[in-house]
């Protein structure tokens, strides 16, 4: 090692130590140098532990057991991700492990530096900090020992768990393991990685190897991972259980189920284990000094750090795996990468050293699979816990990395200088434009064009020759004195025309005194007289002055508009130039295609993970959300992953070399040349394992079928007597009209239909006394139809809906076919209940005869039945709505919710056929949303009480009514109010994470939160629609009018 290298390394170590102490001082507020030095020594240079020790007011060496726990949880890492045994030795490392400790917990710690430090989110260490700040370490260690509770429960019906043909397989969430599912599915869908895992064979002398900790852990994990991958390939189940692999991982993390595992940390640990496992195998199969490790070749690349430290140049080659990127302060992935590749000034402990320091990073070798960690967490010093950054960050489907390659460094430097020059010029232009768009010297600023326009309008207004005060006094003399509030300030409004007003001794002056005591009544005393000008105007201006002023203002306004337009066009051109700076052919030779996006929703201490993975065979995006695997789209991915809109955002991006087709290429049979699919891709031992599992599942299906057959037979035997009784009663029932009229009581028909029918028949009979029943029938039908058309066209208040009074009003408003309307009218006049009235008997007979004469080709019976079925659904929807709103007003929110959910679903189906088929969708949506918010509030209050019974009741409300129905607010058009309501409910529960609470409450909260934060739009449970009681049309109309009137009296902000 050279003297220069010694100097550089010592300088770097001193720099890191001083930076470490500065950070501790900033975070904890402790200025005692001895305490800080002691914390540095006790934590072995680990910032998280030092913060925890100092915050706990214990700067002495902690007990060995505590230290062991934290250090075991710490993954071995350098600044750019684990290199393991593959790291280069004997090189100058100015950016290695030293800085990684700084950036993992606190992104704000180096705000003065342009370099984006690595954050990996909610690691075990960061959660340890949070727990120390919230309670003592001893209290939280009690939470570590508990039984895992499954988030998902298997359906008893195995057919619900049966895999559709060739459908992707999900992974069961076995207790806060959505992080495991997201990462494993992303890697499994890399066919090369899948092949490596499936075809892995442990070393032949594995039984004879010394069982150190790594080998004791890695070999069982590889066995379970192979089994898991084999099931994902060939199982007949919709989803599989990863419990055995997860348990091995959890043991290594020394974690507990109450913590949400961090995707980056887990991926890092997983690749470390895989690297170790394949290294053992590689060393057995080759005698080379450095055997090739397929995991290293797949996931690890190299970069060259070039720079100057205190005036001395250096170069350092390092290996990297997952590449960390800072999100805060950047709008897209390229900006993050640019900041990561160029580091500004490197601080020096020697303040008198004037030598410049800085460095650049250039990729020399990119891995086939390139993973970016998006650092979305920062440490909030005030709250004492990590917080999530929800800023929007865009990323492309194809990422060109030519500009970051070492071989392109010269042309990239030139382009960076050009971009810097353009951005500097852009800043100047934007500042100039801002002066035009925000003009003024006071706190309120306006566009200069508008200022000139307002001045022009004022100058052009018609002058007023009398004082506005005089006008008001004259116009209001009949109605008494005006309140002082309505008088304009004389210093502002009173011009030369008002100078003749009397002085202090005048009557006007004396009359002004009582005006102060007059009570101001809006819309009465202060009403503006109709002859008063609406806008101020200049009192005196000559034609010449006005002409000159208008000319100047017009000219200036045109000049400003031209200048503004020129600036905006120049800014747009510069933006476009910057965007296209790297679009030339030489800079699009290294394409990487987006393979997977790992998404996190929630806050720093808890949340839910899922993955979007590109199906290269079908060329479409798939969403992997635990057991649910669904088709998706780029638009949905963007909505959930870019951030800035909801609490969901991308946390990890996995790109693959677009030219490395072996990553996604299927395996082929060497003899037949056919692609191997499914079980054909599995080695014999795994094929046997999957077949055995499939046989167990098929047996479960057979047993279920047998149980169903036995149950069905028993039900038929029990139902036979009831069926015979029902058939007997059906034969005696009278044949009626549409089934929505079949109520237990016929009084409804007599009040609504019969009375009106009798009235029109009486009128038609009176007008046509000497005519036969057929003529009277035709006249009565015309009269009734005219009445119904008038009702359908009438503009009514919300409480009056004539569609509920008569089916034909509903048909007319929705433009039903003429033949259907005619047939329904004939059924009204042919109703058998009219036979009891002597005047109507013959007319009823004629109507029935005409009904029988209608041929099937004249009226489409299916369409006819469909229209009447829709009307029945409309009436049922109305009853659901009425009952739901009545329960809401009684504050019976659970019952209200169930009825409103049915009303919303039925109404949605009706409105899909026409705008007048159902009720106001916004009204139902509003009260459905309010029900969920009210129930969430009730559940939260019960949880906050801390009483076991209340806590359980609160969680029952959440699990039974909130969690299953939240997805209903996130489907369809996703109204902004619904999305905000969901966010409010989730944030309410996430806020408890930062509060002190009993261990059992913490346990229940952590079990419940992943279900609440699940972004899936899959409905996980739905109650049977509540049964509606028998009701009459009269009752329906009355209750509808009553509830709608009560709503109209509710203030707008209460609805």
Swiss-Prot record:
Residues 169-658 form the USP domain. The modification Phosphotyrosine is found at residue 740. GO terms for cellular component: cytoplasm; nucleus; proteasome complex. Highly expressed in testis especially in primary and secondary spematocytes and in immature spermatids. Also found in skeletal muscle, liver and heart. Expressed in the brain, with high levels in the cerebral cortex. Residues 97-116, 123-140 form the UIM domain. It catalyses: Thiol-dependent hydrolysis of ester, thioester, amide, peptide and isopeptide bonds formed by the C-terminal Gly of ubiquitin (a 76-residue protein attached to proteins as an intracellular targeting signal). SMART domains: UIM (SM00726). One of its GO terms (biological process) is mRNA metabolic process. Induction: Induced by type I interferons (IFNA and IFNB1) produced in response to lipopolysaccharide (LPS) and viral infection (HIV-1 and SeV viruses) (at protein level). It comes from the Eukaryota. It is found in: Cytoplasm; Nucleus. A motif (Required for SUMO paralog-specific binding) lies at residues 89-95. Keywords: Coiled coil, Cytoplasm, Hydrolase, Isopeptide bond, Nucleus, Phosphoprotein, Protease, Repeat, Thiol protease, Ubl conjugation, Ubl conjugation pathway. The modification Phosphoserine is found at residue 85. Pfam families: UBA_8 (PF22566), UCH (PF00443), USP_UIM_N (PF21909). Residues 77-102 are annotated as: SUMO interaction domain (SIM). Residues 474-489 have a biased composition (Low complexity). The active site is at residues 178, 608. Residues 464-509, 728-747 are annotated as: Disordered. Its EC number is 3.4.19.12. Belongs to the peptidase C19 family. Homotetramer, inhibited form. Homodimer, active form. Interacts with ACTA1 (via its C-terminus); the interaction occurs for all isoforms but is strongest for isoform USP25m in muscle differentiating cells. Interacts (isoform USP25m only) with MYBPC1; the interaction prevents proteasomal degradation of MYBPC1. Interacts (isoform USP25m only) with FLNC (via filament repeats 17-18, 20-21 and 24). Interacts with GAPDH. Interacts with SUMO3; the interaction sumoylates efficiently USP25. Interacts with SUMO2; the interaction sumoylates efficiently USP25. This is Ubiquitin carboxyl-terminal hydrolase 25. The gene is Usp25.
């Amino acid at each position: 090692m050279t003297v220069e290298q010694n100097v550089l390394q010592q300088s770097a170590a001193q720099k890191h130590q001083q930076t470490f102490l500065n950070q501790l001082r900033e975070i904890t507020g402790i200025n005692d140098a001895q305490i800080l030095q002691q914390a540095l020594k006790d934590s072995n240079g680990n910032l998280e532990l030092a913060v925890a020790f100092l915050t706990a007011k214990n700067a002495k060496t902690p007990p060995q057991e505590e230290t062991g726990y934290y250090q075991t949880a710490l993954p071995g890492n350098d600044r750019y991700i684990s290199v393991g045994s593959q790291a280069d030795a004997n090189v100058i490392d100015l950016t290695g492990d030293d800085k990684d400790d700084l950036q993992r917990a606190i992104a704000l710690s180096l705000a003065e530096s342009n370099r984006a430090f690595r954050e990996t989110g909610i690691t075990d260490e960061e959660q340890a900090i949070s727990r120390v700040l919230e309670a003592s370490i001893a209290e939280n260690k009690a939470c570590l020992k508990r039984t895992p509770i499954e988030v998902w429960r298997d359906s008893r019906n195995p057919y619900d768990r049966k895999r559709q043909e060739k459908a992707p397989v999900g992974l069961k969430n076995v207790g806060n393991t959505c992080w495991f599912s997201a990462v494993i599915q992303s890697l499994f869908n890399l066919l090369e990685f899948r092949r490596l895992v499936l075809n892995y064979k442990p070393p032949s002398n594995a039984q004879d190897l010394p069982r150190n900790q790594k080998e004791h852990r890695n070999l069982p994990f590889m066995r379970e991972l192979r089994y898991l991958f084999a099931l994902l390939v060939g199982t007949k189940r919709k989803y599989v259980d990863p419990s055995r692999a997860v348990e091995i991982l959890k043991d290594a993390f020394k974690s507990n189920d109450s913590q949400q595992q961090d995707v980056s940390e887990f991926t890092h640990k997983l690749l470390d284990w895989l690297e170790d496992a394949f290294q053992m195998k590689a060393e057995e199969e080759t005698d080379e000094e450095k055997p090739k490790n397929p995991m290293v070749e797949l996931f690890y690349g190299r970069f060259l750090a070039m720079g100057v430290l205190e005036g001395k140049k250096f170069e350092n080659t390092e290996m990297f795996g997952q590449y960390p990127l800072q999100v805060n302060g950047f709008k897209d992935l390229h900006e993050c990468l640019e900041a990561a590749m160029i580091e500004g000034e490197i601080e020096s402990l020697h303040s008198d050293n004037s030598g410049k320091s800085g460095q650049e990073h250039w990729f020399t070798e990119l891995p086939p699979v390139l993973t970016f960690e998006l650092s979305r967490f920062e440490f909030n010093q005030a709250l004492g816990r990590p917080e999530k950054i929800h800023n929007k960050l865009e990323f492309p489907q194809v990422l060109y990395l030519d500009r970051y390659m070492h071989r392109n460094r010269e042309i990239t430097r030139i382009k960076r200088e050009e971009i810097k020059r353009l951005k500097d010029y852009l800043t100047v232009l934007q500042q100039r434009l801002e002066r035009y768009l925000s003009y003024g010297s006071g706190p309120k600023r306006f566009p200069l064009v508008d200022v000139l326009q307002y001045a022009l309008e004022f100058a052009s207004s018609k002058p007023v020759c009398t004082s506005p005060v005089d006008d008001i006094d004259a116009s209001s003399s009949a109605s008494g004195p005006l309140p002082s509030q309505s008088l304009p300030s004389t210093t502002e409004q009173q011009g030369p025309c008002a100078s003749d007003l009397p002085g202090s001794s005048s009557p006007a002056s004396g009359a002004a005194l009582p005006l102060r005591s007059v009570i101001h009544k809006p819309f009465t005393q202060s009403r503006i007289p109709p002859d008063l000008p609406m806008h101020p105007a200049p009192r005196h201006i000559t034609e010449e002055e006005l002409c000159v002023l208008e000319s100047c203002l017009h000219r200036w306004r045109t000049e400003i508009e031209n200048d503004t337009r020129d600036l905006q066009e120049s800014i747009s051109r510069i933006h476009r130039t910057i965007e296209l700076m790297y679009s030339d052919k030489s800079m699009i030779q290294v394409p990487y295609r987006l393979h997977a996006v790992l998404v996190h929703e929630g806050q720093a201490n808890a949340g839910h993970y899922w993955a979007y993975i590109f199906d290269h065979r079908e060329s479409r995006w798939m969403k992997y959300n635990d057991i649910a695997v669904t088709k998706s789209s780029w638009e949905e991915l963007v909505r959930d992953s870019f951030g800035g809109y909801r609490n969901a955002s991308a946390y990890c991006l996995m790109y693959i070399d677009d030219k490395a087709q072996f990553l996604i290429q299927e395996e082929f049979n060497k003899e037949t040349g056919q692609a191997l699919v499914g079980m054909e891709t599995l080695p014999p031992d795994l094929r046997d394992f999957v077949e055995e599992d499939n046989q167990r599942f098929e047996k479960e299906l057979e047993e279920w079928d047998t149980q169903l057959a036995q149950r069905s037979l028993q039900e038929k035997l029990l139902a036979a007597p009831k069926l015979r009784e029902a058939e007997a009663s059906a034969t005696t029932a009278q044949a009626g009209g549409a089934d929505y009229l079949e109520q237990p009581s016929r009084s409804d028909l007599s009040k609504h239909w019969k009375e009106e029918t009798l009235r029109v028949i009486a009128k038609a009979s009176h007008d046509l006394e000497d005519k036969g029943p057929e003529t009277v029938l035709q006249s009565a039908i015309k009269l009734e139809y005219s009445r119904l058309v008038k009702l359908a066209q009438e503009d009514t208040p919300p409480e009056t809906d004539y569609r509920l009074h008569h089916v034909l009003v509903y048909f007319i408003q929705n433009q039903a076919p003429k033949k259907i309307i005619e047939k329904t009218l004939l059924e009204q006049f042919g109703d058998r209940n009219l036979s009891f009235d002597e005047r109507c008997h013959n007319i009823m007979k004629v109507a029935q005869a005409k009904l029988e004469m209608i041929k099937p080709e004249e009226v489409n019976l299916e369409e006819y039945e469909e229209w009447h079925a829709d009307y029945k659904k409309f009436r049922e929807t109305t009853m659901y709505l009425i009952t739901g709103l009545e329960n809401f007003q009684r504050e019976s929110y659970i019952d209200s919710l169930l009825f409103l959910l049915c009303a919303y679903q039925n109404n949605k189906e009706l409105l899909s056929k026409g705008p007048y088929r159902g009720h106001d969708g916004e009204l139902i949506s509003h009260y459905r949303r309010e029900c969920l918010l009210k129930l969430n509030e009730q559940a939260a209050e019960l949880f906050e009480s801390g009483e076991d019974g209340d806590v359980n009741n609160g969680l029952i409300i959440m699990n039974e009514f909130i969690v299953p129905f939240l997805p209903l607010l996130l489907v369809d058009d996703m109204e902004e109010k619904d999305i905000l309501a969901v966010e409010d409910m989730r944030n309410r529960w996430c806020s408890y994470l930062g509060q002190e609470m009993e261990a059992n409450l913490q346990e229940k909260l952590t079990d419940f939160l992943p279900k609440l934060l699940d972004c899936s739009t899959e409905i996980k449970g739905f109650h049977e629609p509540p049964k509606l009681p028998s009701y009459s049309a009269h009752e329906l109309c009355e209750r509808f009018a009553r509830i709608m009137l009560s709503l109209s009296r509710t203030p707008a902000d209460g609805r």
